[in-house]
From Swiss-Prot:
Cofactor(s) annotated in UniProt: pyridoxal 5'-phosphate
UniProt pathway annotation: Amino-acid biosynthesis; L-histidine biosynthesis; L-histidine from 5-phospho-alpha-D-ribose 1-diphosphate: step 7/9
Gene that encodes the chain: hisC
Protein name from the UniProt record: Histidinol-phosphate aminotransferase
Keywords from the named record: Amino-acid biosynthesis, Aminotransferase, Histidine biosynthesis, Pyridoxal phosphate, Transferase
GO biological process: L-histidine biosynthetic process
Cited InterPro entries: Aminotrans_II_pyridoxalP_BS, Aminotransferase_I/II_large, HisP_aminotrans, HistidinolP_aminotransfase, PyrdxlP-dep_Trfase, PyrdxlP-dep_Trfase_major, PyrdxlP-dep_Trfase_small
Family: Belongs to the class-II pyridoxal-phosphate-dependent aminotransferase family. Histidinol-phosphate aminotransferase subfamily.
Pfam families the UniProt entry points to: Aminotran_1_2 (PF00155)
Organism in which the protein naturally occurs: Lactococcus lactis subsp. lactis (strain IL1403) (Streptococcus lactis)
Length: 360
């Protein structure tokens, strides 16, 4: 028997392209177009090159304390991971060990079913409605847990706090995992519900609203008991997942609330103007509460538009996936970048109309 017979087969997650070209408009992986707050002050106070010879803190307690204070929680309710993907992975491995299926929307972050396949977790995709909305009643069935991205990726739609609480009430024997990667761009965080529900785990990230995708910092919040179980699993893999520099930069990003909120508002304003411009061009656009928009044009195939944008050095995201294969996800960049996208789309659509007229 060959060793290949013992391999665990899995279809890996396909990340958005990270091109090395510099003369492009990169709108495919939901990065923040603005730089993070200055870290120079904290580096001068805390960072010493000689400290690189030492292992980092095993639990990033200083950063956890600042996050706990920021959200009015206890430090025992916070765990830091190497990006939210690691925190999600640990959560799947820790909490979803039932024979009943883990429930998730059929249109959502594509890493979820991969975790299930990798960890052999039974799961069930629950169809969203024709407008991509999650139907609360569909999550009131027997399950081994629930995972929902709020706002969702790629649809950018968000549930309100009342809907999430209804799911929590109806599933008090299961962990309900809410992924809030994009919550700062217009959604309503469910962190206040941690005071009432010990079956709630909330995952957030420094990658999007805090402009720190390059250092990989993710966070989970929950009851002290739930977080302690996450630590048990985390420490079974890696005692030192967060390097010292990332911990310092994470703390620095929490120091300037004014700068943080100003950047958020700039992105939201750009998003709303961009949405209006798209609608004027005939696009259908979901009610985005994220730093991206999900769009469809009735007269243009999404795959063809994706390729045309790519040739114009504008990189967006397209999936060959049922129900959304005629939609594109476009990250919100700077005003200048989004204006260039609109100008390209105007020219592309006009050219298409002329071709259609000629064919007639």
């Amino acid at each position: 028997m060959s060793w290949q017979n013992n391999l665990r087969s899995v279809s890996p997650y396909i990340a958005g392209e990270q091109p090395e070209l510099t003369d492009i408009i990169k709108l495919n992986t939901n990065e923040n177009p603005y730089p993070p707050t200055s870290v120079a002050q904290l580096f001068n106070e805390r960072y010493k090159t000689k400290n690189l010879r030492l292992y980092p803190s095993t639990d990033a307690k200083s950063l956890r304390k600042k996050l706990a204070d920021y959200h009015h929680l206890e430090v025992e309710q916070v765990i830091i991971g190497n990006g939210s993907d690691e925190v999600l992975s640990l959560s799947f491995l820790t909490f979803f060990n039932s024979q009943s299926p883990l429930l998730m929307p059929d249109i959502t972050y594509s890493f979820y079913p991969i975790y299930c396949e990798l960890y052999r977790i039974p799961f069930q995709k629950v169809p969203v409605d024709d407008d991509f909305k999650v139907l609360i009643k569909d999550y009131c069935i027997e399950n081994g847990g629930i995972v929902i991205a709020n706002p969702d990726a790629p649809t950018a739609l968000a549930l309100n706090l009342k809907d999430i609480e209804e799911i929590l009430k109806k599933n008090q024997n299961s962990i309900v995992l809410i992924n809030e990667a994009y919550i700062d761009f217009g959604g309503e965080t469910c962190l206040p519900l941690l005071k009432k529900y010990d079956n709630l785990v909330v995952v957030q990230t420094f990658s999007k609203s805090r402009s720190l995708a390059g250092i990989r910092l993710g966070v989970a919040y929950g009851s002290a008991e739930a977080i302690s179980h996450l630590y048990d699993v985390k420490n079974s893999f890696n005692s030192y997942p967060i390097d010292s520099l990332a911990q310092i930069i994470g703390e620095a990003s929490l120091m300037d609330e004014h700068y943080f909120q100003k950047n958020i508002q700039k992105i939201i304003k750009t998003r709303e103007v961009f949405k209006d411009n798209l609608v004027n061009l005939g696009f259908e656009v979901t009610d985005s509460k994220a730093n991206f928009v999900f769009v469809h044009h009735p007269k243009v195939k999404a795959e063809e538009l994706f390729k045309a944008l790519y040739e114009a050095k504008i990189i967006v995201r397209h999936w060959n996936q049922p129900r959304i294969d005629d939609w594109l996800r476009i990250t919100i960049g700077t005003n200048k970048e989004m204006n260039k996208v609109i100008e390209f789309l105007k020219g592309y659509l006009k050219k298409n109309e002329e071709i259609d007229e000629w064919k007639k």
